[in-house]
Amino acid sequence: LAPARWFDQRSVYHAFNVYEHIARVLTVAGELALCDGVAPSSSLMWAAFLHDVSKPDCFTVDHAGSGHFYGHPELGAKKARVIMDRLALSHDLVRDVCLLIKYHDKPLRPERSCLLNMMRALSGEGVDTPRLMDELMDLKRADTLGKAPSCFYYVETIEEMRALARELLAAGEPYTLKMLAINGGDLIRVGVKPGPELGQLLNAALDAVIEDNVPN
């Protein structure tokens, strides 16, 4: 994190340099978890600690003199993996932290399809998607509160998204192929030949269900 010290973000959305921002996000993430009545998880705290680790590497300045950090979530996830692997941390922890970092800055809306697609991106072998989705909201909330006060309004939207995501999960709305009411065997029985087309059709079906164009 040394390059982040005194690194001016040159943005109206940030009241602090990169290092101070990271410190505040880390502190807020832990304190708000305790306020919610739970101990902050290791994955949340590591993600808060490393979420902007690649900002100095991605810094650009536009014609108006404003700073931008395009690609820092993706590069940050890669750098975090290297750091955490070097520390011999568990595979599951590294995987979850990298997912949180990769998507911490992704624009989201409190809409069904948007949140189901986010869960789809977070899902994978061994991933506890409901927990990780909630931690993504925790990270976004802490990240927002570590910016300029003019950004704080977004916390209300984050809580709207959290509530809707929990409703979707409780209702069993599908966000993975395994959650579809049909599978590859069903397609084969109606004449689809085994091969890549099966996966393409199932993914198209999941797209349609997520967009609420067809029922599951």
What are these model-derived regions, one by one?
Residues 2-7, 97-99, 197-208:
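Short linear loop/turn motifs
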Residues 37, 41, 82-86, 146-216:
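Charged substrate- and nucleic-acid-binding regions of tRNA-handling and nucleotidyl-transfer enzymes
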